[in-house]
């Protein structure tokens, strides 16, 4: 079984993130080949990784491609080199030594898999994971509270892409990340596409990883182009009809004025609508691509 782990780095030396991340892969009980795609770091990451982890496949970039497109480079390399599974792992994340074994044991080969996301020191659930996890039938919480034997996996809703295990079959069906998203939102869009193509998301409760971040990660990066991202997540949601898209855009406008007023800049929403109209052909083409199956966005 060939497993590749794709890690996108950008100034990954802070808090020794990239060192801890790659060391956790070396300690995995299942062999895994690391693919590191660096988004033009300036903090020594570009020197540190090839020197200390010479077995990692190293793809330094001359500009910041963003999270999705950088991952696409690593995903394509993994597929081209016979990957059975592709692990997407954040630079600020580490996996438990048995995580890959437990994830692959629970795999049906046709579903996305995720371990339980813990905080940086592994003492509690990652905050975003805690508030977003939604098992489909409630049996996970029932089994936990009643101290029953846990199943290998439980179907769930959307899970952050800090640690995704993608069977190659899923990637060949769904493709890579949509390049219209630069940083944040690309995993939400990918989940929308999984839902459209009826690909399940499975949580493996005995597998764990640690995500060393504050609540919203990089707050500056998260808030940058927030409204563009919100608009894109609506208009590129291939589960929505035209009517539903218009309804969701109106809701976004009302929320912008009612709840996000402090962060609202005069004309922001109108500007995003003008941008949307000027890129309508690109949006429609992207929706068509996302509705098709195949290795879209990877060529």
What are these regions (language model features)?
Residues 23-32:
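Short, acidic, metal-binding catalytic loop of nucleotide-sugar glycosyltransferases
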Residues 24, 38-46, 63, 93:
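A conserved acidic beta->alpha catalytic loop
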Residues 61-81:
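Glycine-rich, basic loop-to-helix element that forms the pyrophosphate-binding segment
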Residues 83-94:
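Short beta-strand-to-loop acidic/aromatic patch adjacent to the donor-nucleotide binding site
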Residues 96-128:
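Conserved donor NDP-sugar-binding/catalytic core segment of glycosyltransferases
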Residues 133-157:
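Short, flexible, basic/aromatic active-site loop/helix in glycosyltransferases
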Residues 157-175, 180-208:
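A short, conserved alpha-helix in the catalytic core of glycosyltransferases
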Residues 223-299:
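Non-catalytic, C-terminal membrane-associated alpha-helical segments of glycosyltransferases
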């Amino acid at each position: 079984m060939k497993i590749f782990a794709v890690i996108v780095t950008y100034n990954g030396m802070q808090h020794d993130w990239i060192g801890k991340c790659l060391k956790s892969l070396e300690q995995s009980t299942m062999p895994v080949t690391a693919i590191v795609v660096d988004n033009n770091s300036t903090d020594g990451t570009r020197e540190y990784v090839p020197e200390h982890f010479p077995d990692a496949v190293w793809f330094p970039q001359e500009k910041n491609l963003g999270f999705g497109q950088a991952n696409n480079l690593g995903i394509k390399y993994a597929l081209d080199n016979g990957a059975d599974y592709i692990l997407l792992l954040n630079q600020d994340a580490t996996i438990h030594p048995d995580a890959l074994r437990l994830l692959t044991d629970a795999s049906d080969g046709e579903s996305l898999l995720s371990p339980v996301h813990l905080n940086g020191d592994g003492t509690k659930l990652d905050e975003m994971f805690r508030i977003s996890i939604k098992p489909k039938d409630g049996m996970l919480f029932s089994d936990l509270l009643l101290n029953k034997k846990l199943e290998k996996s439980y179907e769930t809703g959307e899970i952050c892409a800090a640690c995704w295990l993608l069977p190659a079959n899923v990637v060949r069906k769904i493709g890579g990340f949509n390049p219209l998203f630069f940083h944040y939102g690309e995993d939400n869009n990918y989940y929308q596409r999984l839902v459209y193509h009826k690909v399940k998301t499975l949580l493996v409760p005995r597998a764990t990883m640690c995500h060393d971040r504050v609540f919203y990660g990089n707050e500056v990066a998260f808030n940058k182009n927030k409204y563009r991202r919100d608009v894109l997540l609506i208009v590129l949601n291939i589960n929505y009809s035209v009517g539903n898209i218009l309804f969701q855009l109106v809701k976004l406008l009302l929320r912008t004025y009612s709840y996000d007023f402090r962060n609202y800049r005069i004309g922001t929403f109108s500007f995003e609508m003008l941008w949307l109209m000027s890129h309508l052909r690109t949006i429609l083409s992207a929706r068509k691509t996302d509705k098709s199956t195949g290795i879209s966005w990877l060529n």
